[in-house]
Amino acid sequence: MQLFPLCLIISCSCPTVQASKLCLGWLWGMDIDPYKEFGASVELLSFLPSDFFPSIRDLLDTASALYREALESPEHCSPHHTALRQAILCWGELMNLATWVGSNLEDPASRELVVSYVNVNMGLKIRQLLWFHISCLTFGRETVLEYLVSFGVWIRTPPAYRPPNAPILSTLPETTVVRRRGRSPRRRTPSPRRRRSQSPRRRRSQSRESQC
């Protein structure tokens, strides 16, 4: 099993510093949180159960359907697009590693153990990353952060004192208790009544008085 960390370091040589740090952080226990720069944290994501996140195949299909042109573009679109590129590349290299291990390890038990570790543990991290950045691009980062906070409060509240259903991301802006900071929409106030101009009859009487 000592071969696995070495292979992971080699396979995770993604073309960006952030992706390399991310892979090394998983191995050597560095305090590197890939969500910090986006206002979230690994701990905040951990409130969501593992079965909450779609499969990697579904997430990759979603990313391809919605953002393929931007992901393949040589231009910098947003930090979320960059993070998505890194996560997709890293998962591809992990799959190459799992294939290599499956072909070269003679011990079936060790081979199954390594492949299972990649699919379960590393797979969950990639699923979390993909879900977070796809959701931020789809719903907006502030909405996703509000959802994570709302879900964390809901899951930690005893069942007797919380709503029966967990918050839903797509309906969060309409129902969340955590309000986004910003100016409240202006209310339209009725404009003051304009003073009526003097009627022609009144103006005529005044003109007659001035002539007298």
Swiss-Prot record:
Record GO biological process: microtubule-dependent intracellular transport of viral material towards nucleus; symbiont entry into host cell; viral penetration into host nucleus
Chain intervals for the UniProt region annotation (Disordered): 165-212
Predominant cellular place of this UniProt entry's protein: secreted
An annotated GO cellular component: T=4 icosahedral viral capsid
Basic residues compositional bias, start-end: 178-205
Stretch list, region 3 X 8 AA repeats of S-P-R-R-R-R-S-Q: 184-206
Pfam family for this entry, one: Hepatitis_core
Sequence repeat positions: 184-190, 191-198, 199-206
Subcellular location: Secreted; Host nucleus
Signal peptide range: 1-19
Gene Ontology molecular functions: DNA binding; RNA binding; structural molecule activity
Primary role: May regulate immune response to the intracellular capsid in acting as a T-cell tolerogen, by having an immunoregulatory effect which prevents destruction of infected cells by cytotoxic T-cells. This immune regulation may predispose to chronicity during perinatal infections and prevent severe liver injury during adult infections.
Family statement drawn from the similarity comment of this UniProt entry: Belongs to the orthohepadnavirus precore antigen family.
Protein name: External core antigen
